[in-house]
């Protein structure tokens, strides 16, 4: 079984500089991406402003940190600082979290137990994944969230990309100290590229695997050594390689308490709601905070397999998502279940085709409805009332 949530949004964004890349002289350039767009009977290539999935993930995880701390959910020291190196620097673990370092570096601790220790330590690494390069082994966890690039919707492909002139001046300070060739000039001229567009991006969440280890295939260090208490219960492959014995365990036997898994699933959805409502991603917010307005969105909660929503590039993306889910139901039968949710601001996204799908006019209500169904199904899966 599994419970999944997939989201796509259309965001009207004006005058944003969320994702800068390398400067060109005194010009701070906006990230760009090359896309293929169908035009009549052919395809055309366009270069458009973009915001990377990494920038979105960073903002997403920052919000998760703040909510987790407020709710008493464990967060490691570096994630709390917004440094998402995910225990990827062993020297930092050794100095900042000695108890964790002892577990991760121990040859007597199995790989699943090492991963579980990290999950207990930090909800952000549980949800966002990590790669910890230890001396003898790499501990890897794939992210439970998947994030796309944020791109202009291709239905109209209307966007603006401008270079804005800026001056930073400290004329009184310069006059006070006097000016010479080797001293700073009284003003600094620079340019910032900003963009405006109806953007769209997609986020997928694997709710069932939050709080559950993923390293279920591992080896003991010696043929002659006794199996650990957990490995005695494991399903053994019976294959030996050198002095190693390969073993498999049931991943769900190594997981957090069910109520903690639900809390973290709720945290993940709530953090996404704050990100979408407020646009807390990228940089330049101190002087270039974007005019950010979510204008429509669709969510699909499914079980037991994931169905990714149709991206918000076209005005009938909600209807296409509904048709996709209906098709899966016809194909897979009673084993497959889904619920679809829609948000729509009619004034800001005119001409959107939602078909016969019911929609919420308030984005907060949209997220409440999604969370209610997702957590209901997750609790059913975990055997909670």
What are these regions (language model features)?
Residues 46-61:
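Active/ligand-binding-proximal structured segments within catalytic/core domains
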Residues 1-48, 65, 69-72, 81-385:
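Basic polyanion-binding and macromolecular-assembly surfaces
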């Amino acid at each position: 079984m599994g419970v999944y949530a997939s989201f796509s949004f259309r965001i009207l964004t004006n005058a944003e500089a969320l994702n800068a890349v390398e400067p060109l002289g005194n010009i701070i350039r906006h990230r760009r991406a090359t896309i293929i767009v169908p035009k009549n009977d052919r395809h055309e290539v366009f270069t458009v402003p973009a915001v990377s999935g990494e920038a979105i993930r960073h903002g997403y995880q920052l919000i998760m940190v703040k909510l987790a701390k407020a709710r008493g959910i464990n967060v490691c020291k570096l994630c709390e600082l917004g440094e998402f190196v995910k225990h990827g620097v062993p020297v930092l673990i050794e100095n900042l979290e000695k108890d964790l370092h002892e577990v991760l570096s121990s040859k007597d601790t199995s790989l699943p137990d090492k991963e579980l220790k990290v999950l207990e330590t930090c909800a952000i690494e549980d949800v966002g994944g990590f790669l910890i390069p230890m001396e003898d082994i790499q501990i890897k966890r794939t992210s439970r969230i998947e994030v796309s690039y944020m791109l202009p919707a291709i239905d109209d492909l209307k966007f603006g990309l401008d270079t804005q002139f800026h001056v930073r001046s400290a004329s009184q300070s310069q006059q006070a100290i006097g000016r010479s060739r080797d001293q700073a000039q009284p003003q600094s001229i620079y340019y910032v590229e900003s963009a405006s567009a109806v953007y769209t991006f997609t986020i997928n969440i694997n709710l069932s695997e939050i709080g559950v280890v993923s390293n279920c295939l591992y080896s003991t260090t010696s043929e002659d050594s006794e199996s650990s208490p957990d490995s005695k219960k494991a399903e053994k492959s019976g294959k030996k390689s050198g002095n190693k014995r390969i073993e498999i365990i049931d991943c769900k036997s190594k997981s957090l308490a069910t109520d903690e898994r639900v809390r973290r699933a709720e945290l993940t959805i709530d953090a996404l709601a704050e990100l979408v409502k407020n646009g807390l991603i990228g940089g330049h917010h101190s002087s270039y905070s974007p005019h950010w307005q979510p204008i429509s969105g669709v969510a699909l909660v499914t079980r037991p397999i994931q169905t990714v929503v149709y991206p918000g590039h076209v005005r009938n993306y909600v209807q296409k998502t509904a048709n996709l889910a209906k098709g899966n139901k016809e194909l897979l039968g009673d084993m497959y279940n889904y619920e679809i949710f829609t948000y729509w601001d009619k004034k800001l996204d005119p001409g959107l085709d939602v078909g016969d799908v019911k929609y919420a006019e308030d984005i907060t209500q949209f997220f409440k409805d999604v969370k209610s169904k997702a957590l209901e199904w997750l609790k059913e899966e975990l055997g909670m009332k």
